[in-house]
Amino acid sequence: MTNIRKSHPLLKIINHSFIDLPTPSNISSWWNFGSLLGVCLMLQIVTGLFLAMHYTSDTSTAFSSVAHICRDVNYGWLIRYMHANGASMFFICLFIHVGRGVYYGSYTFMETWNIGIILMFAVMATAFMGYVLPWGQMSFWGATVITNLLSAVPYIGPALVEWIWGGFSVDKATLTRFFAFHFILPFIIAALAMVHLLFLHETGSNNPSGLNSDSDKIPFHPYYTMKDLLGVILLILALTLLVLFFPDLLGDPDNYTPANPLNTPPHIKPEWYFLFAYAILRSIPNKLGGVLALVLSILILALLPFLHTSKQRSLMFRPITQTLYWILAADLFTLTWIGGQPVEYPFVIIGQLASILYFSIILVFMPISGHIENKILKLE
């Protein structure tokens, strides 16, 4: 008699995805972040559901309802800060996950990679709309500034902005629809994540060497289930430390002031995980150009499979491109720092140089270094 997990229609899917899945024996801890993203998503959906039970998406009561959650709901403060800081952990895992994919050449799995880019846009949209919901100063002005960027779209721009606002400014209609979208998107993300895994399991996982690992596979369970469990424990430990000791470390104090359309905060800036893109947006002194650069800063990931010139997949044995990769990582940290600074000298010029460097490394230097390494190794 066959095992039920191998015969039952539902359990069979789970078995092929998480139990008997043949996995490369040498994947490192950088491969833990996919499962951590799944844990983050589940955590966000659960905490978000409980927050939605007490939140009201009306401009007159939204801010008070969040205060009510923190003051009067049993462990409401915990749920709220788990949700807010859970988003930060989500993005830390997301950036590491994408960075791993770039480093080890995982972008050669085209379908998996492209679904991943769509997932990234969906997560960013969800986080942006979630930031608007508490209806603090930074919520309101962030929503105003970012939605206004759509007015740069030629011909239909202004109509598009008013259509998204549901009026002539960010108001009740905007908040209500943002709440609706913020609620539905995580479920769409969960569905997309399943498609992401479906395509990944068509090809099998990549590994640090970038070589074919068909000859050396081990079952996912118990090896990687245990390894993932350790990652989950560390993630929850980090999140717990953040929530219980430094709940407002990554937030903006301006968001503790109720939204006021008549009073602009001195420095409008998004949450830390958007600062790199915000810095790229601000570094171009033209509205449409800035918006295009903003979108391209993420969409450029879709070009990576076509810019791959090396005969080797991974950067593991490619010191020149490795150096460029870490310069790119440092450049992203620089952009993140600049995005949080006021628009004045010397921050403007640093941001512009960092933005140029970002696109240059990806579009010019990395493809060239791939060719150079091929020549050195006599692969061309």
UniProtKB/Swiss-Prot annotation:
List of residues binding heme b b566: 97, 196
Transmembrane intervals: 33-53, 77-98, 113-133, 178-198, 226-246, 288-308, 320-340, 347-367
Compartment(s) where it occurs, according to its Swiss-Prot or TrEMBL record: Mitochondrion inner membrane
A Pfam entry, by short name: Cytochrom_B_C
Binding site for heme b b562: 83, 182
Co-factor requirement: heme b
InterPro entries named among the record's database cross-references: Cyt_b/b6_C, Cyt_b/b6_C_sf, Cyt_b/b6_N, Cytb/b6-like_sf, Cytochrome_b, Cytochrome_b_C_euk/bac, Cytochrome_b_N_euk/bac, Di-haem_cyt_TM
Any one GO molecular function term: ubiquinol-cytochrome-c reductase activity
PANTHER family noted in UniProt: CYTOCHROME B
Membrane topology, from the record: Multi-pass membrane protein
Subunit: The cytochrome bc1 complex contains 11 subunits: 3 respiratory subunits (MT-CYB, CYC1 and UQCRFS1), 2 core proteins (UQCRC1 and UQCRC2) and 6 low-molecular weight proteins (UQCRH/QCR6, UQCRB/QCR7, UQCRQ/QCR8, UQCR10/QCR9, UQCR11/QCR10 and a cleavage product of UQCRFS1). This cytochrome bc1 complex then forms a dimer.
Presence of keyword Ion transport: no
Gene Ontology, cellular component aspect: mitochondrial inner membrane; respiratory chain complex III
Similarity comment: family membership: Belongs to the cytochrome b family.
GO annotation, biological process: mitochondrial electron transport, ubiquinol to cytochrome c
Cofactor binding mode and count: Binds 2 heme b groups non-covalently.
Residues annotated to bind a ubiquinone: 201
Miscellaneous comment text of the record: Heme 1 (or BL or b562) is low-potential and absorbs at about 562 nm, and heme 2 (or BH or b566) is high-potential and absorbs at about 566 nm.
Keywords: Electron transport, Heme, Iron, Membrane, Metal-binding, Mitochondrion, Mitochondrion inner membrane, Respiratory chain, Transmembrane, Transmembrane helix, Transport, Ubiquinone
Name of the featured protein: Cytochrome b
Function in brief: Component of the ubiquinol-cytochrome c reductase complex (complex III or cytochrome b-c1 complex) that is part of the mitochondrial respiratory chain. The b-c1 complex mediates electron transfer from ubiquinol to cytochrome c. Contributes to the generation of a proton gradient across the mitochondrial membrane that is then used for ATP synthesis.
